[in-house]
A protein has these predicted regions:
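Mid/C-terminal beta-alpha module of Rossmann-like enzyme folds, strongest
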Residues: 200-263, 277-331
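N-terminal Rossmann NAD(P)H-binding glycine-rich loop of SDR-like oxidoreductase domains
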Residues: 2-30
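Substrate-positioning beta->alpha
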Residues: 101, 162-163, 181-203, 210-213
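Conserved beta-loop-beta element that borders a ligand/cofactor-binding pocket
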Residues: 118, 138-162, 169
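Alpha-helical membrane-targeting segments
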Residues: 43, 166-191, 231, 236-277
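Residues forming the Rossmann-fold NAD(P)(H) cofactor-binding site
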Residues: 17-19, 96, 135
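NAD(P)H-binding glycine-rich loop region in Rossmannoid oxidoreductase-like domains
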Residues: 38-101, 105-108, 120-124
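SDR active-site strand-loop-helix element
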Residues: 10, 34, 79-80, 114-120, ...
């Protein structure tokens, strides 16, 4: 594939985006990494030849920067999303209006293919603002770019993930493991599989205009995931169920903490199963074999084991370069 073909990845320096950038560069695309902080995206440049991976300042909330990012692009991928609002209205600004803006300007620029990363549970009528605005974003995407491919992953895991790393760190410090909505079901999907699904969606004619739900090979209850984290980190901790009333009080307090580790909106999401809808197209329909949690997660949770502080974290650069080969995954 000629390197003159251009792909734009909004949020390309993020957890999922970096894996997509790597694959596009490997396929020979000139990759525009459209991000708010170009300095934070410089680590991606070695994924391609000189000048092939180009960090570009853009915000999905800004018309001019989105226009510049999609102009002349053959393919566009939107991975932008947030888990918590810093200001009221951020979910709608980013998930709904931002997604619609990307689709509208991509269509106007003559972009051939557009892939949008949404989330399982996206529904304009959802109680959670996160899920509702994700649903609104999907609707705006389809209205502006009818051939958009929408991918809805469940909980995404990988070396840079939020959930497994966060709770492993908590287990290292806390004598108990708090469990909120422990019976809620998740179908964790590997970040590399999500990126492979994006690449398949960009190249398959039958993916245009379709929606896929992405989940791994096993459905886990939330308490099972937490117990698995304790097992893989070698930590013996009491698992303590937290009543919803107390959880709401904790969330109200944590919303005022920098980084907002828990919000009331996240509690709403935790009360709904996050699994692939039966008979919905998924990874296998895109030719991707789902990767089990057990094949990848132990590799990057080793550092949380007793005495594991001396072990290096798997490289945040998904090119696979790391000083400790025992931590390499198939990516």
């Amino acid at each position: 594939m000629a390197t003159r073909n251009v792909a734009t990845v909004f949020g390309g320096s993020g957890f999922i985006g970096r894996y997509i950038v790597k694959r596009l560069a490997h396929k020979g695309y000139v990759v525009r990494v459209a991000v708010r902080d170009t300095e934070a995206a410089l680590f991606l440049k070695p994924m391609g030849a000189v000048g092939q991976v180009v960090p570009l300042h853009a915000s999905v909330a800004n018309e001019a920067t989105v226009h510049r990012a999609v102009e002349g692009a053959d393919l566009v991928v939107n991975t932008v999303g947030i888990l918590a609002e810093q200001r009221p209205g951020d979910f709608r600004l980013i998930h709904a209006e931002g997604a619609g803006r990307v689709a509208r300007l991509a269509a106007a620029a003559g972009v051939a293919r557009l892939v949008h990363i949404s989330a399982i549970g996206a529904d304009p009528n959802a109680a959670s603002r996160y899920a509702a605005t994700k649903g609104e974003g999907e609707a705006q995407m389809r209205a502006a770019f009818s051939a958009v491919t929408i991918l809805r992953p469940s909980l995404v895991f990988g070396p840079e993930d939020h959930l497994f790393n966060r709770f492993a760190a908590m287990a290292r410090l806390s004598p108990v493991m708090p469990v909120i909505c422990g019976d809620t079901k998740f179908q964790p999907v590997y970040v590399g599989d999500v990126a492979d699904a994006v690449m398949a969606a960009l190249s398959r004619p039958d993916a245009a205009g379709a929606t896929y739900e992405l989940g791994g090979p096993r459905v886990w209850q939330f308490r099972e995931l937490l117990a698995y984290i304790l097992k893989e980190t070698g930590r013996r901790r009491r698992m303590m169920d937290v009543p919803m009333g107390l959880a709401r009080v904790q969330a109200r307090v944590m919303e005022m903490v920098p980084g907002k580790p828990l919000t009331r909106d996240q509690l709403l999401m935790l009360q709904t199963d996050n699994v692939v809808t039966p008979n919905t197209p998924g990874l296998q329909d895109l030719g991707v074999v789902p990767t089990p949690v057990e094949l990848v997660v132990p590799l990057y949770l080793r550092r949380f084991q007793p005495g594991g502080g001396r072990r290096p974290l798997p490289s945040g650069d998904p090119s696979g370069r790391t000083t400790d080969l025992s931590y390499q995954t198939k990516d």
